[in-house]
Amino acid sequence: MLTEIHPKLPMRSKVLTRNYYINKLGFHEFGNIDHPGYLMLKKDHIQIHFFEFKTLDPKENYGQIYIRTEHIDELYQQCLDNGVDIHPNGPLQIKPWGQKEFALLDPDHNLITFGQTVS
């Protein structure tokens, strides 16, 4: 039986990634040990793990995740209020497949898309 999934994304700088996800997106760090080259963050029921990839070229990074959420309008506004740059092709909108979505690129150009089912 599958119970959870925790995506692992590349990061060039643990400090930069930590600060972005905590200060801009409202995540918090968890775990009792600071693992060299590895970062674990959590918000609500979502965990995202990051592994160090110092030579990553952000323009060549195709890391991406899709996060289902509730109250997407409020989440979108919080991102705007926190100065998060929304992806140019990813402003909040209803998609033909029945999801209300928005997307952003983190400092390493991992594409993070948030979506909520619309009735």
What is each PLM-predicted segment?
Residues 1-16, 65:
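N-terminal beta-strand motif that seeds the catalytic metal site of vicinal oxygen chelate
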Residues 26-32, 86-89:
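Short secondary-structure junctions
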Residues 21, 54, 79:
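Short, flexible helix/strand-to-coil boundary loops that buttress conserved ligand/catalytic motifs
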